[in-house]
Structure formats: C-alpha cells, structure tokens
C-alpha cells in the first residue's frame, strides 16, 4: 500500500542558486523540479511539498544561440487584434527576472497548485537577498552538468571547470 505524506510531516528546505552565466532553460528545469518536490522520495503529484529556491544574479543569465534577440514571447490583451510580442532582450531590460520566471512557470502545473508552487521561487537581480536567515543550501548549477553554463567561444572556461579539470 502506498503511503502518503501528511501536511504535518512536510518539511520545506531553502536552496540558493547563483545564475551567473547559466543557460535559462537548463536552470529552469532544475528549479522546477525542486519547487515541485520531485527531488524528494515522498513526491506526490497532487500535493505541494516542494522546497523554496532563491536565485541571485538573474540579470546575468544567458541564452544559447541567437534566442536572446530572436525568440518571442506572446500574450493577448483580450481585445480583438490585441496580440503582443516581446523578445527576451526587451523583457529583461524592463524586468530582469521575468524571463526565468516565465520559463519556470511554464514547467509547472497550470492550476491552483502550480500558482502556489510558483510562490516558492524568489528571484533577485543582485548578489544580496533577504533570505539569509533561512540558511539556504547552495546549489552550484555548473557542477550538475557542464552544459548548464555558457562558455565563451575562444576556449576559456569559467573557474568551475578548471578546478574540476573537466575536458570538453
């Protein structure tokens, strides 16, 4: 018989991720799994027992290829002819964290549970955040997979790769 976790038994942890040089989609998949609680053995699709995620330096996230200028996000005002489009470049000028928030939001369920889970995502464009009292565990996104960080095209690697001697 399958055992379900009760609300009293749910413990939420806090995680901190530095988004400097991280690829948007790869970062969003890691974050959405943590927010949904898929990293726990007690995962149940209809319950919210995910963890909180604090993302700092979100203004330094990257897209691969030319998606930063060419990708388009669409929305509709509700009026006839009211479809609007915006590129990630223009959206990040107005709201730096909105690009990552949209990517994570689209990976969550679309109902009330997804909205509740999205409130566990805290995005900050600088180095500082007000959640240091929760003692978040640090997740180094570059050490999970070497494709999670954008390298420059001239062969120089970030310090994460030279310390671990990962070859490409």
PLM region descriptions:
Residues 1-102, 108, 112, 130-168:
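Ribosome large-subunit tunnel/peptidyl-transferase-proximal elements
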Residues 108-124:
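C-terminal structural segments of small proteins and small subunits
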